Structure formats: C-alpha cells, structure tokens
From Swiss-Prot:
This is Acireductone dioxygenase. It holds the Pfam family ARD. Pathway: Amino-acid biosynthesis; L-methionine biosynthesis via salvage pathway; L-methionine from S-methyl-5-thio-alpha-D-ribose 1-phosphate: step 5/6. It comes from Klebsiella pneumoniae subsp. pneumoniae (strain ATCC 700721 / MGH 78578). Fe(2+) binds at residues 97, 99, 103, 141. Monomer. Binds 1 Fe(2+) cation per monomer. The lineage of its organism: Bacteria, Pseudomonadati, Pseudomonadota, Gammaproteobacteria, Enterobacterales.
C-alpha cells in the first residue's frame, strides 16, 4: 500500500504526519509541486520481463505523459534481490541528489521509497505498483530500493541522455528510516 510519512529535518526519527490514503497523499504532495497519481499497472508481464516488454505493455501511459509534457526519452529500471549490483546501486541512489529535469516514475511492479527534501521537511513516499510520481526538477531527494529490491518502474525523461544526477554532498539521507 502506498504511504506518505512526513518528517521535520530537525527530528528525523519522529514522523509529523503519516497516511496510506491515496487522496491525502496526493493532496500533500501536490501542495509541494510533486505529482502523485494512482494509475493502472494491470498488464501481465510474466517473470523477469524485458524492458521492451514493459515499454510495449505501457506505451499508452508513456504516450500520455509525452503528450502532456513533451518528454523525449524513457527506459525501464527493474531490480530484484538477486542482482549482483544491488548494494552499489542502493548506495548510489541513497545519496541526496537533484536533476535538471523532473524525475518521473511509473511503478508497474514492486515498491521503492522516494525521499524528498523540501525546505525544512522530508517527505518519504512509499511508491508501489500503480503509482506515478513526478519529482520537480532541482528538488533534493534520494531513493531507497531496500536491501532486497523488487521493483520495475518506467522512467521518463526530458533529457534524451536519461538519468543524470547532481549529488548535493549532504548526508541527510543517513538520518532517516530506510526500507528493510
């Protein structure tokens, strides 16, 4: 179940607000300029689908976003617990960073935790299958896939080069709860 937990940057262990209600999550995030919607990830992808299979199954969703915002490229990130690079990838994504473009993800399988550092607050958004999130350009954030990752998400970009991060050097992420 999708969830949003809100923290103050002054107390990273005590939640200020928490909800699993999609409308409440959407309202909180929309107020900060973050798009959050529940879409339908209802296509049968089979076991370990190829990126091409995922793209073909959800081309209609990609086309909708391209028509709305003019995105130029997309790909699929899919990580499982047996991935030999899971620890290195987790550490990379756990470092606070920004992008020069919106970070758009549509989760079609599994879950991951987006943590958004907005002003003096941290919004931990547990995204699961059916969730679309768009983090605005230049928003400091990090992503936790957990120690045993299990997710597939379509990534959509303004930049044809794909995922390009500017790391902030702030170790704020280490103070907040992580996925198991």
């Amino acid at each position: 179940m999708s969830a949003l937990t809100l923290f103050s940057v002054t107390d990273p262990q005590t939640p200020v607000w928490h909800s699993t209600d999609a409308k409440a999550i959407q309202a909180q995030l929309n107020a900060k300029g973050v798009r959050f919607e529940r879409w339908q990830a209802d296509r049968d992808l089979g076991a370990n689908p190829s990126p091409e299979t995922v793209i073909a199954a959800y081309q209609h969703a990609i086309d909708k976003l391209v028509a709305e915002k003019g995105y130029q490229s997309w790909d699929v990130i899919s990580l499982r617990a047996d991935n030999p690079q899971k620890e290195a990838l987790r550490e990379k994504f756990l470092n606070e960073h920004t992008h020069g473009e919106d970070e758009v993800r549509f989760f079609v399988e599994g879950a991951g935790l987006f943590c958004l550092h907005i002003g003096d607050e941290v919004f931990q958004v547990l995204c699961e299958k059916n969730d679309l999130i768009s983090v605005p350009a230049h928003t400091p954030h990090w992503f936790d896939m957990g120690s045993e990752p299990n997710f597939t998400a379509i990534r959509i970009f303004d930049n044809p080069e794909g995922w390009i991060a500017q790391f902030t050097g702030d170790d704020i992420a280490s103070a907040y709860p992580r996925l198991a």
